[in-house]
Regions:
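Buried hydrophobic packing segments
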Residues: 21, 25, 198, 290-301, ...
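Extreme N-terminal starter segment of soluble prokaryotic enzymes
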Residues: 1-5
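Glycine-rich phosphate/nucleotide-binding loop
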Residues: 45-48, 114, 222-323
Length: 345
């Protein structure tokens, strides 16, 4: 059966890295028989330019009907102070599709160890996943700003916590079987609920070790001993901070993918970096985050584990061969990097 994939190229370098990723997808599909069709839609700044809205109605309709969604990058300086901004489209898309679970793999490629701000012995063997609750908590609570007082409400239901904890256990079960739940239960009521739910869900996963860590301690460990972690799960605010902290371990945002999952609808796959408008159109953008996001899509949405493994191995082999774009210390163009990865599939 043909799989429908909606491609949201977005802004800046987005169209360039999207096309690079789709070239890799087409190549692996030709080799393995994966049948798919691409539906390109405007989104972000491109959506505003086309329709006046960052998430056009037709784009949302196509996304709802898709089997998976690829997003490259959004954001443009021309909208920095505008009433309608590209980023509003992403928030709306997450809400409309109920994308409650954000997944960020953090893996250090040995050939890029020198880029990390940490010493080689600190980052050796780092390979973990951050699972962040994406649709609840303080970001979606009431925000009250008065003249001399302000309040932000951090609100979680049992059901919201249970589904993200369960998702994290399922991921841990297929890895090293260690789940670290991060909270601030010595202070926050929401964290007390979080820890209680984690303990209850753990009974359904006796093969997975559950550990608890306070968020301040976890932030320290992510720098002093990041290889300790296998799967991390935490609430929206803590997850936002910790996932950004984890992204600096590799020394570059150009090689890190992510996914956002709903309970029943399509998932969204995207690089963690921005639209880099300063290099848009120059043909020098690093496509690896986009390509690895496509590998995540093949594995998570379509169960094509071997295809995903082949892409990831090809990326690793390309980097090991010293073929690098400018952001990671080389001179390869977007096209040259893409062709090198395809040659190693």
């Amino acid at each position: 059966m043909t799989k429908k994939i909606v491609a949201l190229a977005g802004d800046g370098i987005g169209p360039e890295i999207m096309e690079a990723g789709l070239e890799v997808l087409a190549s692996i599909a030709e080799k393995t028989g994966f049948d798919f069709e691409i539906d390109r839609r405007p989104f972000g700044g491109a959506g505003i330019d086309a329709t006046g809205h960052p998430l056009p109605d037709e784009t949302l309709k196509a996304a709802r009907e898709a089997d998976a969604i690829l997003l490259a990058a959004i954001g443009s300086p021309q909208y920095d102070n505008a009433a309608v901004r590209p980023e509003q489209g992403l928030l709306a898309l997450r809400k409309e599709l109920n994308l409650y679970a954000n997944i960020r793999p953090v893996k250090i490629f040995e050939s890029l160890n020198h880029l990390s701000p940490l010493k080689p012995d600190r980052i050796a063997g780092v390979d973990f996943v951050v699972v962040r609750e994406l649709t609840g908590g303080m970001y979606f609570g009431d925000h009250i700003l008065e003249d001399r007082k302000a309040r932000d409400i951090n609100d979680y239901s049992y059901e919201e916590v249970e589904r993200i904890i369960r998702k994290a256990f399922e991921i841990a079960r297929n890895r090293r079987k260690i789940l670290t739940s991060i909270d601030k239960q010595n202070v926050l009521a929401t964290s007390k609920l979080w820890r209680r739910v984690a303990e209850e869900v753990a009974k359904d996963f006796p093969d997975v070790i559950l550990e608890h860590q306070l968020v301040d301690s976890a932030a320290m460990l992510m720098i002093t001993n990041p290889a300790k972690f296998d799967v991390i799960v935490t609430e929206n605010l803590f997850g936002d901070i910790l996932s950004d902290e984890s992204s600096v371990l590799s020394g570059t945002l150009g090689v890190m993918p992510s996914a956002s999952h709903s309970e029943n609808g399509p998932s969204l796959y995207e690089p963690i970096h921005g639209s880099a408008p300063d290099i848009a159109g120059l043909g020098i953008a690093n496509p690896i985050s986009m390509i690895l996001s496509i590998a995540m899509m093949l594995r998570d949405s379509f169960g094509r584990y071997e295809d995903a493994d082949r892409i990831e191995c090809a990326v690793e082999a390309t980097l090991a061969a010293g073929i690098l774009t400018r952001d990671i210390g080389g001179q390869a163009s977007t096209k040259e990097m893409t062709e090198a990865i395809i040659a190693r599939l």
